Amino acid sequence: MTYEVKSLNEECGVFGIWGHPDAAKLTYFGLHSLQHRGQEGAGILSNDAGQLKRHRNMGLLSEVFKNPANLDKLTGTGAIGHVRYATAGEASVDNIQPFMFKFHDMQFGLAHNGNLTNAASLKKELEKNGAIFSSTSDSEILAHLIRRSHKPTLIGKVKEALSTVKGGFAYLLMFEDKLIVSLDPNGYRPLSIGRMANGAIVVSSETCAFEVIGAEWLRDVKPGEVVIIDDQGIQYDYYTTDTQLAICSMEYIYFARPDSNIHGVNVHTARKRMGAQLAREFKHEADIVVGVPNSSLSAAMGFAEESGLPNEMGLIKNQYTQRTFIQPTQELREQGVRMKLSAVSGVVKGKRVVMIDDSIVRGTTSRRIVQLLKEAGASEVHVAIGSPALAYPCFYGIDIQTRQELIAANHTVEETRQIIGADSLTYLSIEGLIDSIGIETDAPNGGLCVAYFDGNYPTPLYDYEEEYRRSLEEKTSFYK
């Protein structure tokens, strides 16, 4: 990768376990629950009495481990796993995690969810001092920082490295005798800790993975925290006290599974509240509510309950196609929208439809769905979005890193309405979003990062700053 501001970057899912004889198999099941967070590649690294073993490849988890022998060989009582979407770096096997590093004095595995905002500067400095990178992923940078630290203890080395990298990150580090887990100072990415019946400790991007393996949730990892897990138990520490919660609001809006809980808030419940608040802000007459499956169904329920309108199944999704936001090229997204949804004419014909969707990024999906509903006979289609207008890029690990690819950054609400062919377009207010999610915290914006909506980033953008400032002067329309 060249570390410029580039489009189509997203997030991943990580899972780890310490202290179970079936660690790799449980990691497989955990990753299966996180498959929605990335479909380009997957991998598992196991720890068998200090011996690290790994299998990784391109494709879905089931494809990567299609041969049972590849999972069976990953013996040991500790494991970390990763499902990947190309946050940074090219889509190749070399960039599939977990990474494994073997130096003359240490070996360890690494899994990372997020994006580093000072990766270019750090990589340049590391290479200048002799570091050799085996991938184009920014995730590899932390390993070189750990290796080159002069701190006398391993934990000291890890803390120093974590204090050097900037951006949004959740790290799982598998060493010979311990698993170390950490979050960035703002906790942009979700990460939770659980416990198995036998005492094994598990870590996951989302709590939905705990249900599958029978683990009990203990607590969420805190911003700036270092969690050390070994045979003696769990130790909680910090590499910085300069922390302030600003978790990605898109986790609640779109990314996370409805059955996951993040910072004490159930995702389905938050989305229902978003839908209810959206109904209070909606100003048009309608007959039925139709949610775009699957991530908008919770918001549609809340909208219908608040408005008193019937919630109908006016759109059917082919469950065997990939999520369009996560596919890595615009051409694939266009094809994906055509393949994934069908309108139910018997439900929408002659009706004024409120079409609930979670967000509008490029407008590709919204325009096609409005067209589908009108072709099926809907007399009016009013688009109601369960999030504010997405007008600013994200640099902490989401699939939007240039303003040029955001329709709301380049068009007014009325222009966007015309482009997507809707009879009206309503976005949820930022205040409505914050209140709907309702994290119990004193942090600004209710503990959420809402920079995608208002352009106020919680941290400096480092290597991305200059390009971002330049992009603010540009206005692009990709619709003619």
Sequence positions of predicted segments:
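Conserved short alpha-helical segments that host acidic/polar catalytic motifs at enzyme active sites
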Residues: 1-223, 228-286, 292, 380
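Flexible loop/turn segments at secondary-structure boundaries
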Residues: 22-24, 87-88, 118, 188-189, ...
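A short acidic (Asp/Glu
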Residues: 55-56, 183-184, 299-302, 393-395
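Generic beta-strand/beta-sheet core signal
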Residues: 111, 174, 182-183, 194, ...
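Secondary-structure transition/capping motifs at alpha-helix termini
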Residues: 131, 151-152, 283-287, 305-312, ...
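Phosphate/diphosphate-binding loops
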Residues: 160, 208-209, 216-217, 221-225, ...
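PRPP-dependent phosphoribosyltransferase catalytic core
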Residues: 162, 177-178, 214-220, 314, ...
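Short, glycine/charge-rich flexible loops or terminal/linker lids adjacent to PRPP-binding catalytic cores
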Residues: 308-353, 364, 391-398
